[in-house]
Amino acid sequence: MARYRHSRSRSRSRYRRRRRRRSRYRSRRRRXRRRRRSRRGRRRRGYSRRRYSRRRRRRY
């Protein structure tokens, strides 16, 4: 049983790593895109840069 448990935990960690890499790549693509569009909108609404960065850090 010990052997089975070990192999199971290993597969889990591998799955997590793959998932993280994919999400990071996707977010980079979107940022990009979003930055070009939202730069003007942000200034109009008066968003602070510090606040936005804090939200981002919490998410990822």
Curated annotation (Swiss-Prot):
It comes from the Eukaryota. It is found in: Nucleus; Chromosome. One of its GO terms (cellular component) is nucleosome. GO terms for biological process: chromosome condensation; sperm DNA condensation. Testis. One of its GO terms (molecular function) is DNA binding. Keywords: Chromosome, Developmental protein, Differentiation, DNA condensation, DNA-binding, Nucleosome core, Nucleus, Spermatogenesis. Its main location: nucleus. Residues 1-60 are annotated as: Disordered. Belongs to the protamine P1 family. Protamines substitute for histones in the chromatin of sperm during the haploid phase of spermatogenesis. They compact sperm DNA into a highly condensed, stable and inactive complex. This is Sperm protamine P1. It comes from Petrogale concinna. The gene is PRM1.
